[in-house]
From Swiss-Prot:
It is found in: Mitochondrion inner membrane. It is a multi-pass membrane protein. This is Cytochrome b. GO terms for biological process: mitochondrial electron transport, ubiquinol to cytochrome c. GO terms for cellular component: mitochondrial inner membrane; respiratory chain complex III.
Amino acid sequence: MTIIRKKHPLIKIINHSFIDLPAPSNISSWWNFGSLLGLCLIIQILTGLFLAMHYTSDTATAFSSVAHICRDVNYGWLIRYMHANGASMFFICLFLHVGRGVYYGSYNMIETWNMGIILLFAVMATAFMGYVLPWGQMSFWGATVITNLLSAIPYIGTTLVEWIWGGFSVDKATLTRFFAFHFILPFIITALVLVHLLFLHETGSNNPTGLNSDADKIPFHPYYTIKDFLGVLILLMAFMILTLFFPDILGDPDNYTPANPLNTPPHIKPEWYFLFAYAILRSIPNKLGGVLALILSILILALMPLLHTSKQRTLTFRPITQTMYWILVADLLILTWIGGQPVEYPFITIGQTASIAYFAIIVIFMPIAGMIENNILDLD
């Protein structure tokens, strides 16, 4: 068996990636989220495939086909709710995975980090298009509002929006193309994940100390396979509790009303995992400025390696930057809350303050904190 595992051209790739991979001996549970994201992606692709067998991407029948899946298809309700809540679990793992990368300075592995940012954008695009497919009120109006933002692009904006819509409003053509893209993107994401792993295995994993761990490596299997399996069990437990007991808790009641272009819902808002970016978008009175801030709220992650001023890689031994980091986490939670609130006083002011704080902490305060720590420790 060992001979096959190490010699077979296909199996040896798996062997070098998941079995004989040298891994740092001290990586904590924060390193579990990569495998959990892989699991989420597999769940989403499988449930999505079975949903696509029964779904129809036509404005006249889309809403009814989802109702048909839930009522008439064997375990259709389970597949549908697993897919809907699977997206939420996916984003929880994504945010924790990115948060881990920021905390432990993993952004210094630039190729892996940039690939991760591309993956984040791809997953967000996929989730947005997926939300449009049930063709409820929030699906329709969410698609209208978000695609309309592209009209802020000078000169080509209006043409671009009509090209994406396939007409003069969100309609049948839009739904059909969104379904096509929503179906194909997860497979593209899978390919990008392999590239992400390829880049990671070029450098090896980071660890909580941020120090070189070449002198103290252990094989991935059995140590981290068993550790990942525990993470998988906990994730599946939480996932099934959410899906079976509270399937609609993260959804919007408006999406149980069929899409009606003549009736605007009182509060148009995206799914919870986009609320922080939506709050930043709404905080800027100018349309183009809002769109740029929205894109920058994610793209700013690409600047992280350039903004790293500390002589130490991780925040493990850096209490000042740690404080900044946790203020940033709190700020993101505030933005998420504000994104779900109506556009009125005091929420507008809170949102604007939190948006300024978000960019200021990353661009100004964390780099300054790093320099102060260098000074305190005489690392200059």
